Amino acid sequence: MKKLLVLFASLTMFACSKDLGGEVTPINVPSSTTLTGNITATTTLTSDKEWVLKGYVYVTDGAKLIIQPGTIIKSDISEKGALCIERGAQIVAEGTAAKPIIFTSGRPAGERTPGDWGGIVILGRAKTNRTSEPTIEGGIGRAFGGTNDLDNSGILKYVRIEYAGIAAMPNSEINALTLGGVGSGTTIENVQTIYANDDAFEFFGGTVNAKNLYAYGTADDDYDFDFGYRGKVSNSVSKRDPQFVDNGDAGNGVECDNDGTGSTAEPFTHPILDG
């Protein structure tokens, strides 16, 4: 049985500060709302409160998740969160340079570590080179790909993804941003990953174009292409942190495979890297 979206709204909390005149001034601390299960209708995450992902949260076929500029989404600490946009669903996360949308760990600042939560997974209906319908890795358990290379999964602009990347099992991880069969109608621009515990950006097939991506301090690959990805990634860079490496993986700036076995399945993986 599918779980419904459950919103646990906490009461607004207050802290106090004492000014030089001896007056006690209340300071509003934003309330938090927990997201869990399935999002089945158009839902807006507003910037006036803090949002928490508890476990795997799915935006289902026909639903749309809208996220306002400046919104902060954290993960539950004990039940690590991940956000999956299923085929036929959309995410509209359109931040600005002054008000980016931030996905991050639920731990206090200064205590956050890579792998504190899963990451963002977007699935579409564009072509892959799999002969049977593939299921995205990382324990998400949702199919991706199809025949519509123009498919539109929404907008991701001015978004920062921090401390993501968990392994559901060996060789089956969630990356900071995973794109499976995402079509060229989707907009991916100005997205930064920080301390991803697996790959920063991985493209499993599809035709989505992306620009102005920045991967910082990634454990494994900064950019990973496979399963017949045929889009363009432009004006994108990465920077490594020598103090943070995953000795179990041969992390690369770019990894590009047709598939895990190096087959000649078509369409061939053929990313265009431009600047």
Model-derived regions: residue spans:
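Beta-strand/loop edge motif enriched in small/polar residues
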Residues: S17-G275
